[in-house]
Amino acid sequence: MEVILLERIAKLGQMGETVKVRDGFARNYLLPLGKALRANAANKARFESERATLEARNLERKSEAQQVADKLDGKSFIIVRSAGETGQLYGSVAARDIVDVLAAEGFNINRNQVNLNQPIKAIGVHKVTLHLHAEVDVAVEVNVARSAEEAERQAKGESLTSAEAIYGVDEDALKPEDFFNPEAEFAGEEE
């Protein structure tokens, strides 16, 4: 099916382009969300008459998204979760958790704008990309920790999942002799 794009869509085209897409993609996504029109003579004429309005609206949305991106750029957000001593979370941090933290800070971001390929399942500082507009992306840091104190330590660059952090032992200084005695007699069954 051929459609006329009403806004820029990643990996598909710019506003005003006529592109050929699969019928299901057009019927289930592009047309219901108002991102495209069927490419027929009447809709082409309608698009050309409304083109200036659509471009102005798109420019306004882009400038609003850019203002939010400027406020978010370089910010770090702390999420406190319970985790095991190795740093594995009991559960995970998903896009909705990040949206909740951003909302608490006064940013109105939708869950589908958070670009998180898979949930965060370990403590640490993670980079998360927010897709605010078709042409505006911003990266923020999400600091997942067991407590606010640990979040501060992680922000300074300290690792909380190393053997030193967990057991108070420098893992580079460990030798095999620390764990077993090489001169010990074999206590198992002999052949």
From Swiss-Prot:
GO cellular component: ribonucleoprotein complex; ribosome
Keyword Nucleotidyltransferase: no
Biological process (GO), any one: translation
Record GO terms (molecular function): rRNA binding; structural constituent of ribosome
UniProt cross-references to Pfam families, sorted A to Z: Ribosomal_L9_C (PF03948), Ribosomal_L9_N (PF01281)
Similarity field: Belongs to the bacterial ribosomal protein bL9 family.
Role, per record: Binds to the 23S rRNA.
HAMAP family: Ribosomal_bL9
Stated name of the protein: Large ribosomal subunit protein bL9
Gene: rplI
